[in-house]
Amino acid sequence: EVVGALDVDLDLDHGELAAFDLLDADVFGLGRALEQVTDQVLEEVLAWQRRPLEALYPVIYLDAIIVKVRDGGHVRNKAAHIAVGVDMDGIKHVLGIWVQQTEGAKFWAAVCAELANRGVRDVLIVCCDGLTGFPDAIAATWPEATVQTCVVHLIRAATRFVSYTDRKSVSAALKPIYQAANEEAALEALEAFTASEFGRRYPSAVKTFTDAWDRFTPFLAFPPELRRVIYTTNSIESLNYQLRKVSKSRGHFPNDQAVVKLLWLAICDIEDKRARARAKERGLPATQRKAGGRLVEGGIVTNWKRALEQLALAYPDRINPHL
């Protein structure tokens, strides 16, 4: 709606601004005018970024994408930090976007503190990457939160130095570790992988898991439905994929504020387009519907009722007052 009101057609599914390219606009002398256009949404962006939040989020996903931002006379890589929360109804919400020079635990601690200031008193499980210092940064705000390393990130790190021809086979060989019934079985699977041909060929893959073991294993204590919710940041990875397409097509952003504004507009535009596509297919048989579901905002976690039941068993004193 905001995008439509501004008459700026963000054709983000193809990674393009159909009406304008905000970053190349200076070449044509349009930079000032386009800055005024995006300034019209700044007030709404700030209201969104500062809005009150729920007291409890059962799960929060934390991640970041790298964007290029003009800084003085240079273009630097900066991290756009993104938080996605799952509320008690299983509905996903983008809680905010923050820009910083690098993705670091110290800055994430500030993000968590800001979320607390906006009303988040407790989080049961925080899913994040394996950044050193992340657990301490989260514990400073939510000391009882379970910190779970994203398994997708972990596998990606474990296969970073694996040859392309072996990558699929190594990924398959790692599955028994993160699909194990419990931590003991996972450790046995890791030992088996370590002794295997792939384990001997790629000791860095073994080290990735051993170094992250304490942050990797929390989800192994939960039943399958809850594991699927917490062991990966897929909810935010799909969002990041779309936002990376936008940022790459831009080349670089003029400043940090432009990053937040454009990424917010991107989220609005993607969700609006998907909603319109679903509306067109309403009434058709499921086999004929091709429109995608919600990207993140307003989407409901699959099998949430069952996952919530398991959360209530695992964290009764913290979750029951909110049921």
Label the model's feature ranges.
Residues A33, I125-T132, A137-A173:
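Conserved beta-strand -> loop -> alpha-helix junction used to position metal-binding or nucleic-acid-contacting
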Residues E1-L30:
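N-terminal low-complexity segments that are often proline-rich with Ser/Thr-Pro
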Residues V75, Q100-G104, V126, C150, ...:
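A generic short alpha-helical patch detector that favors 3-5-residue windows
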Residues G31-E35, V59, N77, A105-A109, ...:
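Amphipathic alpha-helical transducer elements in NTP-driven molecular machines
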Residues A19, A25, E35-E43, V67, ...:
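A broad, structural surface signal
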Residues T38-C128, T132, D136-E144, S235:
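RNase H-like nuclease fold core
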Residues P176-L323:
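Acidic/histidine-rich catalytic cores and adjacent linkers
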